[in-house]
Regions:
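Intrinsically disordered, low-complexity regions enriched in acidic/Ser/Thr/Pro/Gln residues
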Residues: 1-87, 92, 98
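Histidine/lysine/aspartate-rich catalytic loop segments that bind and position anionic ligands
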Residues: 75-121, 127
């Protein structure tokens, strides 16, 4: 560390180091996302995403989908009570395995990712359900988790669909 500065006016701490960064290179590859907040992702995330191709052999039966949706929509949850939070469910075939909820849809997705990582769960035969819209960010997160099927009770953005096609992710939504 070569220096630390605090700017009270904008409530920011700046830490300087001798380490080199590729920040300027990342800024050149900046991409606006299709989520509600018009977030920003940087090129290295997209470069990593574009290398991932999910298996085209992932299948979901209509009977599994009907059973899953019935189970998810009748299992007691904060989402069903309040409707003011987001829920995500990790499924295998026609069975829900793990429910996670949060006020932020990204956080609910991240909880599933963390759970899978901690429990060393293999994603290739899993189905991912979310109450949130299927924006580009949700597609990227699901693909990075290597889950081949993503379901939502909501719709998707055009860029989300485009990214899903590029990675072989199966989308099911309104």
């Amino acid at each position: 560390i070569t220096g630390i500065d605090y700017d009270e006016e904008i409530n920011t701490v700046v830490v300087r180091t001798k380490l080199k960064t590729n920040y300027e290179e990342k800024l050149k590859k900046k991409t606006l996302t299709s989520g509600c907040a018009q977030g920003t992702i940087f090129g290295d995330i997209m470069e990593e995403f574009e290398k991932i191709k999910l298996s085209k052999t992932a299948k979901i039966k209509a009977s599994w989908l009907i059973k899953l949706l019935k189970e998810i929509n009748t299992t007691p949850s904060l989402y069903l009570k309040a409707r003011a939070i987001h829920g995500c469910v990790l499924c295998k075939k026609d069975k829900a395995q793990v429910y996670m909820e949060d006020v932020g849809r990204h956080n609910a997705v991240d909880k599933i990712a963390g759970y899978m990582y901690k429990k060393s769960i293999k994603p290739n035969d899993k189905i991912f359900y979310t109450t949130g819209r299927l924006t580009s960010e949700m597609i990227i997160k699901t693909v990075k988790m290597r889950i081949p099927i993503l379901i939502s009770r909501n719709g998707f953005t055009s860029w989300g669909v485009e990214l899903a096609k590029k990675s072989n992710l199966t989308l099911i939504g309104r």
